[in-house]
């Protein structure tokens, strides 16, 4: 699993810290950090929540073209 650069960049564009995104999703900041580092594979429901908060699609954030 690689780093989720798209999610990190989208979060930054939205002006959210890891803690702010975590609070909106009801998860810990460590969970957001682990997803962005590629150390944690989130559930589909968490992926959908992240997409809703950031205003993007699953393809935008989680689809790997490689």
Language model regions located:
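Short amphipathic recognition helices of helix-turn-helix/homeodomain-type DNA-binding modules
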Residues: 60-66
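Short alpha-helical DNA-recognition segment
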Residues: 16-34
């Amino acid at each position: 699993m690689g780093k989720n650069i798209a999610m990190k960049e989208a979060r930054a564009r939205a002006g959210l810290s890891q803690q702010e995104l975590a609070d909106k999703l009801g998860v810990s900041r460590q969970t957001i950090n682990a997803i962005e580092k590629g150390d944690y594979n989130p559930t589909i429901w968490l992926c959908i929540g992240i997409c809703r908060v950031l205003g993007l699609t699953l393809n935008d954030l989680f689809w790997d073209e490689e």
